[in-house]
Structures are given as structure tokens and as C-alpha cells.
Amino acid sequence: MLARALLLCAAVALSGAANPCCSHPCQNRGVCMSVGFDQYKCDCTRTGFYGENCTTPEFLTRIKLLLKPTPNTVHYILTHFKGVWNIVNKISFLRNMIMRYVLTSRSHLIESPPTYNVHYSYKSWEAFSNLSYYTRALPPVPDDCPTPMGVKGRKELPDSKEVVKKVLLRRKFIPDPQGTNLMFAFFAQHFTHQFFKTDFERGPAFTKGKNHGVDLSHIYGESLERQHKLRLFKDGKMKYQMINGEMYPPTVKDTQVEMIYPPHVPEHLKFAVGQEVFGLVPGLMMYATIWLREHNRVCDVLKQEHPEWGDEQLFQTSRLILIGETIKIVIEDYVQHLSGYHFKLKFDPELLFNQQFQYQNRIAAEFNTLYHWHPLLPDVFQIDGQEYNYQQFIYNNSVLLEHGLTQFVESFTRQRAGRVAGGRNLPVAVEKVSKASIDQSREMKYQSFNEYRKRFLVKPYESFEELTGEKEMAAELEALYGDIDAMEFYPALLVEKPRPDAIFGETMVEAGAPFSLKGLMGNPICSPEYWKPSTFGGEVGFKIINTASIQSLICSNVKGCPFTSFSVQDTHLTKTVTINASSSHSGLDDINPTVLLKERSTEL
């Protein structure tokens, strides 16, 4: 009672008409419902807690809490004791049991069906059924609260430009200690923009990606009209062109597909792919080209296996196979690298067949915001001994043609990416993109960083110094925000102290992993009815999925089968080259890259 009275008094002191739920009084995922104008009630149903604010654990919950290790303890165990994990990885039933626990414990943190969106902070049919919205992990802060974060902090948030300049902008490039490379950085950017497709004409809370998951619309197009323009309608294949004996995407002129290119780009360099923004940087077009080649390769395999099949069945089955390949690569290569675990992750949909699991997904606005990993980007891009700055690199597909995919893969495999957590590692070229992320979070009325930590079962920070793990940035944040409980979600993710020798801090992993794994395993192809050889054209197609890796994808589609992975293998290869490239421009010297990045690709 005392705690409740104090929270209400604080709200009333700041605003006589404050919504009683502004103080976020309901804990442990309890739901706050206003009762009259100055009272509230917490719905603790199925939370495992009871009491006025859902703070008293039930008996079984109390036991679970006593036995459950902290996220950092779990991370330590999984990233140490390599010898033990090598043994576990070889014992199938143990590996399966642990992987099943990883999948269920993470994915159960995501509400399914979805619950809220920017306009509905309560359960509603509109929030459930309207696919044009991103869903929300936490409801928006009520409109009638005394401060932007509810009752904590100042009445106005700090200037977003100041936040970016003081704690986010790079002073000096900080390489990722996990050895993450640019093959990873561009894979992340390419992969996620099949479902991060904000409809900025309607606002940051809306999406054009109505499938809300891994549908490969960045390869095939979001609409049927776009897909048809990109298809060859022969043997299931996508349109392509041959340049120097190698397959590349067709041009905008040949397909009449809408793409975003500045007027300075020559027609023959305006490649057309599923995602309209992928002309932005050659790294994205590299992956677009690789997946185009893979689709057409799989079509050839299926055509040989099923000469009786027509174009449509070859196309549709190849698409399902590529979805399977993507999910396997993301879990076993991409997430495996990010985790730093010695435990070997496994893509096996059958692990969940006897579990309570819903094969549907809805992309959350917070997941989109969380995935703004711009500190990965280097200051320059090093390709085959040449150096390209941002102005030379963006909207310049001639770089891809000049060097070819083999050199791109080799060079990006060797070049180290930046560390995401720890602050002050954001490239100046994307300063405006980062500012826009903060502004859009405010427009969508995100709750505070600490509220999101509680949402994902992580203890809230008690001070800025605990958040950053140092004193200088902590003091800057203290001056900007005044209260750790008023710290914003997005900048906090980037300034949070990294885990030891890791790319991310605790919250990025604990909040990001549930969204990621639920989205991957919630795909229809992972369901019992779909996950069988016949869905993928028989054992041949099923094998393509079950043997997929980032290395096999490259070997099947890039001349010479260059070695690749998502981390730099030899630290001696990360040294900076000093040769300055002046060739391969496309008349873009007079274009400000930061303006283009802001106007055309706020999400990228």
C-alpha cells in the first residue's frame, strides 16, 4: 500500500490528472488497468505472482527464482568450459535437450498472438488483426502522463542530436573483440530488411512487410506484381543478366521494378531486386546477387529431379528451400557467432513438435529499433587492397562489378566490424539515421530502458554508472536524463557496457534473442505439416536445407569457393590498407551520403 501511495503521490504532484498507470506499478508482466480517474488494478493472471502490484511470488515461482541463474551466469557458463561443451555437442540427446530449452525459454517471452500497438495500449481486435502495424513488447506510455517516461525523469527528454553527439558518435573506430566481420554486417542488414520495412508515409509504427517474418520478400518482392516483374517464368527462375560470364540481377529498365537510386546512377548500374533500398551499398547487392544465383541453382536441381514440374511449382518450391536455408544459416552460423557460445546451436524444427508453440509471428517495433547495429560499420571499406569511403561506396554498383563477388567475399571476410555496445562507436556517416531512431522511438512513446529490462526478466539498472560500466559517459547521461529510470531504450542499448570480450551488452541479447528465435522457429516451414521432404521436392531439396551453411552458400554461387565465415579468422589480416581509391565512382562525388542515408534508408 505504501509503495502504491508513493507512486500515486509522485504522479499527482507532477500532474493532477495523471493516468494512474503512468507509474508502471504492475510488476512481473502484470497488466495495469485504470479504475476511475485515480485508481488502478493489476491483473496478475498466470504471471506466477500475486498481490496488489503482482510482486509476491507464488510457491512454485519462488522455487524457480531461487534455482534460476542470472542471465550473465548462464552466458558465462555457455562461453566457458569448452572441453565440457565439446562433449555435450557430441551427445545428441543432451544437445537436443539444451537446444529445446534455449528455444522454448526464449520464444515464450514473446506474446503470441500479439497484444499491443502504438495506438492501443490495451488488448483489442485492431491490435491483433491489423497487420500494417508493428506490434509492441510493451504498450506505449499513456498520453496523459506527467513525463515522457511516465512519472520518472524530466518533463522533456534531451535533444536527440545532443544524445548522439555526446555518447554515441565514434571518436575512434573500436573493433569488435569477437572478430565480427563485414560479411556478418552486410548479412545482418540484408537478412533483416525482409521484415523491417517501415512505412514512413504512415509513420514509424507502420510496416509494409505484412508477412512479419522470414518470407524472403527482399529477394522476391513484397507484392505479387513486383515478384512477377522479377521472374523469368521459365523453369521457376528469376530474371538475370550475364556480365563477364557471371550472373547478376537484371536492371530496372529491363524489369520496370521500382528501386531507389539517385538520378546520377547510370541505367546499366541500376540493378533490380526484391527490396527497393538494396541499391544503397554494394555489400547489400552482393548478398542479393548470391541469393539470386542460389535460387536459380536450386531451380536447376529441382528441374533435374522433377522434369514433370512446371514453372510455378519449381519457383514456389525453390522459395521454400531458400527460406529453410536462410533459417539454418541464421541459427547455426549467424546466431552462433553472435552468442559466443561453445554449445553448438542446432536448427531442428522437430525439437518443438511436442511443445506448446504457435507457428505465427508479428514483428515488434522494439525489435526493429533494437536491430539498428550501425556501430558495426567501419570508417572505410577495404576491397582487394583499395579503400572506399562512404561517398565512394553508396549507390555504386560499379564497385561490385569491378572487383567481382569473389574479391568482395574475401575482403569482407577479412575486414573487422565495429563493436556495437559500449558507446561512442557510431560512424559519423549515419549520425542522422541514429538521431531519427531516437526521434521515432519517442514518437512511438517507448517505455524506459529499465522497463524493457524488467519485461525480459533482467534486473533494472540502479545508476548510469552501472549501465555504462565507467564514469565519463555515465556523467554525460546523468546530465542529459537525470534519472536512470528515464533512460531511453535505443541509446541505452548502444552505451550499455559490453559483456566481457563480446559485441553486445546484456540487454541486447536478452531482449533480442526471444524476438529472433520466435520469428525463425515460428515460420510455417518449421511446423509439423510443412517440415517433411515432400514440401521441398523430396530428399534432394530437404538435403539442401539440412546441409546449408554460409560457406556452402558461397561455394555454390561464388567463383573459386572463397573461404568465408562471420568472423575474422586471422587478426593479422585486419590491418588497414592505405591505398586511396579514386576509381569506380559513378558521378556521386557531389552527393552528401549522410543526406541520402537519412532520406532513403532510415532503417538501414
UniProtKB/Swiss-Prot annotation:
Keywords: Acetylation, Dioxygenase, Disulfide bond, Endoplasmic reticulum, Fatty acid biosynthesis, Fatty acid metabolism, Glycoprotein, Heme, Iron, Lipid biosynthesis, Lipid metabolism, Membrane, Metal-binding, Microsome, Nucleus, Oxidoreductase, Peroxidase, Prostaglandin biosynthesis, Prostaglandin metabolism, S-nitrosylation, Signal. The conversion of arachidonate to prostaglandin H2 is a 2 step reaction: a cyclooxygenase (COX) reaction which converts arachidonate to prostaglandin G2 (PGG2) and a peroxidase reaction in which PGG2 is reduced to prostaglandin H2 (PGH2). The cyclooxygenase reaction occurs in a hydrophobic channel in the core of the enzyme. The peroxidase reaction occurs at a heme-containing active site located near the protein surface. The nonsteroidal anti-inflammatory drugs (NSAIDs) binding site corresponds to the cyclooxygenase active site. It is found in: Microsome membrane; Endoplasmic reticulum membrane; Nucleus inner membrane; Nucleus outer membrane. The gene is PTGS2. It comes from Bos taurus (Bovine). Pathway: Lipid metabolism; prostaglandin biosynthesis. The keyword Magnesium does not apply. Its cofactor is heme b. The modification O-acetylserine is found at residue 565. Heme b binds at residue 374. Binds 1 heme b (iron(II)-protoporphyrin IX) group per subunit. Residues 18-55 form the EGF-like domain. This is Prostaglandin G/H synthase 2. Its EC number is 1.14.99.1. It catalyses: (5Z,8Z,11Z,14Z)-eicosatetraenoate + AH2 + 2 O2 = prostaglandin H2 + A + H2O; (5Z,8Z,11Z,14Z)-eicosatetraenoate + 2 O2 = prostaglandin G2; prostaglandin G2 + AH2 = prostaglandin H2 + A + H2O; (5Z,8Z,11Z,14Z,17Z)-eicosapentaenoate + 2 O2 = prostaglandin G3. Homodimer.
